């Protein structure tokens, strides 16, 4: 079984990754040397633990965003996704079919003046069985 990593190791590794992301990689030995250069770590054992966790996190970061670590590259990617504007607006269609509840919500959001709204009755998509014993 693996060992439990302390709060100190995890916090130190996260800070090192946020500040020195470009100098780190997936290799433990290079990460160990980088940790030795940039931080004052009191013992060899602690340095190795931090470098090991840095390596572990770097592998996870390559697969996707990691909670608790904010890297400039990931922040820019998230901004791009959040600010995405589609080529054709959903409101530019000829007829937009909505149910009565959606029509009411659009009125409350001051979109009630849209001329291409067509109110349709919602179709019940699920077949609910009668309860047993009835």
Swiss-Prot record:
PROSITE patterns: RIBOSOMAL_S17E. SUPFAM superfamilies: Rps17e-like (SSF116820). Its main location: cytoplasm. One of its GO terms (biological process) is translation. Pfam families: Ribosomal_S17e. Component of the small ribosomal subunit. HAMAP family: Ribosomal_eS17. This is Small ribosomal subunit protein eS17. InterPro entries: Ribosomal_eS17 (IPR001210), Ribosomal_eS17_CS (IPR018273), Ribosomal_eS17_sf (IPR036401). It is found in: Cytoplasm. The keyword Flavoprotein does not apply. Keywords: Cytoplasm, Ribonucleoprotein, Ribosomal protein. One of its GO terms (cellular component) is ribonucleoprotein complex. One of its GO terms (molecular function) is structural constituent of ribosome. NCBIfam families: PRK01151.1 (NF002242). PANTHER family: 40S RIBOSOMAL PROTEIN S17. Transmembrane segments: none annotated. Belongs to the eukaryotic ribosomal protein eS17 family. Component of the small ribosomal subunit. The ribosome is a large ribonucleoprotein complex responsible for the synthesis of proteins in the cell.
């Amino acid at each position: 079984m693996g060992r439990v990593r302390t709060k100190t190791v995890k916090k130190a590794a996260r800070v090192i990754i946020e500040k020195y992301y470009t100098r780190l990689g997936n290799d433990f030995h290079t990460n160990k040397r980088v940790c030795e250069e940039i931080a004052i770590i009191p013992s060899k054992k602690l340095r190795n633990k931090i470098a090991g966790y840095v390596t572990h996190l770097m592998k996870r970061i390559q697969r996707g965003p990691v909670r608790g670590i904010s890297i400039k590259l990931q922040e820019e990617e998230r901004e791009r996704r959040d600010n995405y504007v589609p080529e054709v607006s959903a409101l530019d269609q000829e007829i937009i079919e909505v149910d009565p509840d959606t029509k009411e919500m659009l009125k409350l959001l001051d979109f009630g003046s849209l001329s291409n709204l067509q109110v349709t009755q919602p179709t019940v998509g699920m077949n609910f069985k009668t309860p047993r014993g009835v």
